[in-house]
Amino acid sequence: MAKISAAQVKELRDKTGVGMMDAKKALVETEGDMEKAVDVLREKGVAKAEKKSGRVAAEGIAAVAIKDNKAAIVEINCETDSVASTDKFKNLVTEVADKIAEEEPASVDDALALKTANGTVKDDVIETTQVTGEKISLRRFQVVEKGADQSFGSYIHNGGQIAALVVLDGADSATAKDVAMHVAAINPEYVNREQVPADRLAHEKDVLVKEALNEGKPEKIVEKMVEGRLNKWLSEISLDDQEFVKDSDQTVAHFVESKGGKVSSFIRFEVGEGIEKKADNFIDEVMNQIKD
């Protein structure tokens, strides 16, 4: 059996970020072959990732990468905010977002198959799982392409808990960034009221009519009252009609128009939205750790 030196163990740990005992075991298993040891650890990393696949990864980072006329907004999840704050995880998010913006994959599976310096994006995710000990997952992304007369604007809030990407027609990137900040803060649902689906509009109107009648309002004034309430609701969910967060004396549409443009589209990601966090009791948590 080959003798394994402390220097070899350190080198392998530096390459992979694993613990001392894991590094030593891999070197013993491969009789000191550094490259094979890296492969062994990566294979064990796959096993770790599969073992952790039942966990809920609801923390993480949302990020935006802009590459020429393309931009990607990405969410990558982990299990705890402490891992989300590590350089290892942050670097993974940055590299994956950049790669997605460059390559424009069609799906998460396609994104995971993209080539990187270490193999593929999936390999990088697995390695991060191995180093951090947590389930890491590329949850979602969108890629947007802009025209020559359009501009991108992005805004990241609270270290990546919220990311917003905006495309403007005719206005500059500084204006787009201001609008992205508004989107991150206010969370509109549509660019303008014309985008609100007809069935949703009809449903809201029906609810408002019944609400007004239940308040005992005379039928002859219900229609006018509902019209006012419906208009207020539309202004609350439509970006163009919202009071601009940096200047409540004007709407977002007026602000952008004053800069010579209009809003084309926006995307907003909030980390963990729609993910139901698993609530383990203390005993279950300890038992799960023992099983790991």
From Swiss-Prot:
One of its GO terms (molecular function) is translation elongation factor activity. Residues 80-83 are annotated as: Involved in Mg(2+) ion dislocation from EF-Tu. Keywords: Cytoplasm, Elongation factor, Protein biosynthesis. Gene3D superfamilies: 1.10.286.20, DNA helicase RuvA subunit, C-terminal domain, Elongation factor Ts, dimerisation domain. Pfam families: EF_TS. Associates with the EF-Tu.GDP complex and induces the exchange of GDP to GTP. It remains bound to the aminoacyl-tRNA.EF-Tu.GTP complex up to the GTP hydrolysis stage on the ribosome. Belongs to the EF-Ts family. This is Elongation factor Ts.
